[in-house]
């Protein structure tokens, strides 16, 4: 090592000047006095604590969690009002029965599409027109919104019975998004 760079050079002087020398006779008595005057027992607080706001906070958190779980279950099991308006309900309401007797010829009447379109709601009409135009059902491409957690960036929209000027304005405004 280079001269004058010993890390222990000045340490000895500090210990010599600051350390107190004790007599060997009093050492045991001094240590006993030191440990008898121990204040560690006063550091522990054995008194009963008041529950206070922590209980109220816990109850608030529990109530919030319960409400969230109930909301989740309601969202899971409650039918949306649109489910009762489906194609099956409106088409099955008009069931065609053909009476047949023994030996008679069974004939099933072919109901034209125009009769179905006239008899049922506009929604069924629009869904049927979509299926005829695209060879796939609108409900196969889409689903009812249930939660934000399962969102997709792909959008499917069906427009029917809109004015030509509205259609042109939608085409120009949605061109950047499609």
From Swiss-Prot:
Organism: Cottontail rabbit papillomavirus (strain Washington B)
GO molecular function, one term: ATP hydrolysis activity
Gene designation: E1
SUPFAM superfamilies hit by this protein: Origin of replication-binding domain, RBD-like
Subcellular location: Host nucleus
UniProt main location, coarse: host cell
GO BP, sorted A to Z: DNA replication
Enzyme class: isomerase
InterPro entries in the cross-refs: PPV_DNA_helicase_E1_N (IPR014000), PPV_E1_DBD (IPR046832), PPV_E1_DBD_sf (IPR046935)
Keyword field: ATP-binding, DNA replication, DNA-binding, Early protein, Helicase, Host nucleus, Hydrolase, Isomerase, Nucleotide-binding
Primary role: ATP-dependent DNA 3'-5' helicase required for initiation of viral DNA replication. It forms a complex with the viral E2 protein. The E1-E2 complex binds to the replication origin which contains binding sites for both proteins. During the initial step, a dimer of E1 interacts with a dimer of protein E2 leading to a complex that binds the viral origin of replication with high specificity. Then, a second dimer of E1 displaces the E2 dimer in an ATP-dependent manner to form the E1 tetramer.
GO cellular component, one term: host cell nucleus
The enzyme's E.C. designation: 5.6.2.4
Catalysed reactions, semicolon-separated: Couples ATP hydrolysis with the unwinding of duplex DNA by translocating in the 3'-5' direction; ATP + H2O = ADP + phosphate + H(+)
Family the UniProt entry places it in: Belongs to the papillomaviridae E1 protein family.
Name of the protein in its database record: Replication protein E1
């Amino acid at each position: 090592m280079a001269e004058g760079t010993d890390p222990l050079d000045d340490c000895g002087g500090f210990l010599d000047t600051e350390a107190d020398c004790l007599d060997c006779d009093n050492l045991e008595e001094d240590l006993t006095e030191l440990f008898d005057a121990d204040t560690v027992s006063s550091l522990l607080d054995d008194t009963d604590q008041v529950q206070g706001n922590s209980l109220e906070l816990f109850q608030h958190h529990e109530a919030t969690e319960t409400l969230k779980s109930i909301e989740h279950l309601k969202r899971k099991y409650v039918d949306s009002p649109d489910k009762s308006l489906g194609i099956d309900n409106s088409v099955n309401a008009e069931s065609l029965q053909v009476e047949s007797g023994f030996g008679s010829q069974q004939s099933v009447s072919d109901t034209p599409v125009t009769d179905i379109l006239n008899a049922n709601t506009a929604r069924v009409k629009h869904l049927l027109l979509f299926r005829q135009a695209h060879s796939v059902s609108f409900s196969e491409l889409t689903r009812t919104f249930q939660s934000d957690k399962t969102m997709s960036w792909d959008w499917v929209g069906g427009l029917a019975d809109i004015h030509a000027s509205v259609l042109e304005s939608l085409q120009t405004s949605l061109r950047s998004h499609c």
